């Protein structure tokens, strides 16, 4: 197989992620949608802090690139399934190009065009949203008992998120990346959920 067809892509709604989360199974499609939802908020927030001269259409183009890249970023999992991060690291310790990388490249040319060949800024923003969504999902549905495996993974991802934000601040200083911290705090706060009564009554 050298290209995914539409049936393969639609299977993303049935391929499960997160082997460590037992309370609610999350499909690749659910994760993809959630990352795109985060990007819909994150990109405008980042743009609002942009200090360099901005070309016409820059915000729309960046948002489009991020949304498209996010669509493809985990699509190879419809073929490979969920591979635990330690296993991925073990495989990739073998060299620059591994069988896993080769398989992902064969999945679909669009995967290469829209994600792996995306601009560094686009990839950085997608990774930011990806980490934020993972922290959110584990916070909502993971085992919150101290030192449980899920709890340790969540804290590890949270640390990776903060490290990524630090690196983004150094590599793309025209943006104020602290807005990502604020958005993540909002995502983790149940009180931020909209109450239907407040909509109906105009509160």
Swiss-Prot record:
The record's keywords, sorted A to Z, are:
Cobalt, Hydrolase, Metal-binding, Nucleotide-binding
Which positions does UniProt annotate for Co(2+) 1 binding? 31, 73-74, 130
Q: Which cofactor does it need?
A: Co(2+)
Residues that bind Co(2+) 2: 77, 82
Metal-binding found in the keyword field: yes
Annotated binding of dATP, by residue: 17
- Record's cofactor remark: Uses a typical 2 metal-ion mechanism to dephosphorylate dATP.
GO MF annotation: an example: nucleotide binding
Reaction(s) catalysed (UniProt annotation): dATP + H2O = 2'-deoxyadenosine + triphosphate + H(+); dADP + H2O = 2'-deoxyadenosine + diphosphate; dAMP + H2O = 2'-deoxyadenosine + phosphate
Q: Coiled-coil segments, which residues?
A: none
The entry's function note states: Catalyzes the hydrolysis of dATP, dADP and dAMP into dA. This step is essential for Z-genome synthesis (containing aminoadenine instead of adenine). Specifically removes dATP and its precursor dADP from the nucleotide pool of the host, preventing the incorporation of A into the phage genome and favoring the integration of the Z-base into the viral genome.
Family label: Belongs to the Caudovirales dATP triphosphohydrolase family.
Name assigned to this protein: dATP triphosphohydrolase
């Amino acid at each position: 197989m050298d290209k995914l067809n539409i049936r393969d892509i639609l299977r993303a709604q049935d391929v499960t992620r997160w082997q460590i989360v037992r309370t609610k199974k999350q499909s690749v499609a659910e994760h993809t949608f959630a990352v795109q939802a985060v990007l819909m908020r994150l990109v405008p927030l980042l743009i609002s802090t942009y200090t360099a001269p901005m070309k016409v259409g820059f915000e729309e183009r960046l948002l489009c690139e991020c949304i498209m890249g996010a669509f493809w970023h985990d699509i190879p999992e419809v073929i490979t399934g969920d591979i635990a991060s330690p296993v991925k690291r073990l495989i990739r310790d073998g060299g620059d190009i591994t069988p896993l990388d080769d398989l992902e490249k064969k999945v679909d040319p669009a995967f290469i065009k829209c994600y792996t060949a995306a601009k560094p800024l686009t990839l950085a923003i997608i990774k930011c949203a990806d980490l934020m969504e993972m922290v959110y999902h584990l916070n909502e549905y993971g085992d919150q008992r101290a030192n449980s495996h899920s709890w340790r993974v969540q804290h590890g991802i949270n640390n990776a998120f903060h490290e990524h934000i630090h690196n983004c601040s150094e590599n793309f200083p025209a943006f104020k990346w602290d807005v990502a911290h604020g958005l993540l705090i909002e995502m983790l706060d149940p009180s931020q959920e909209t109450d239907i009564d407040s909509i109906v009554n105009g509160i």
